[in-house]
Amino acid sequence: MRTILVSILAVLAVGCATPQTFNERLLAGYATVTETRQTAVTLVDAKKMSSADAVNVQQQADTARAGLDLARSMRASAPQQAEDKLTATQTIVRALRAYLLSKEAK
């Protein structure tokens, strides 16, 4: 799991194409939520995160997933609100990813 996360971060660091369109960013958000869930489990197995902490991460991932679902459902009727929701959700996902990276380093 760490290899996957490091690979993704390396790709982003060298300037490879980042998701640009709403749908690309939405898909990247879903993928990152899935990755976040898997990383939390891996960190618990490696004894780098407590079970209670992992439950909290999973709950935050649930919130992020709900935000992505809401952004997707709003896209046709309220495009600007959908963009705003997607941007806010991306912030949550980035914070979760940063938190998990800090746990991996310990």
Model-derived regions: residue spans:
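Cationic, hydrophobic amphipathic alpha-helical membrane-interacting segments
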Residues: R2-L5, A10-K106
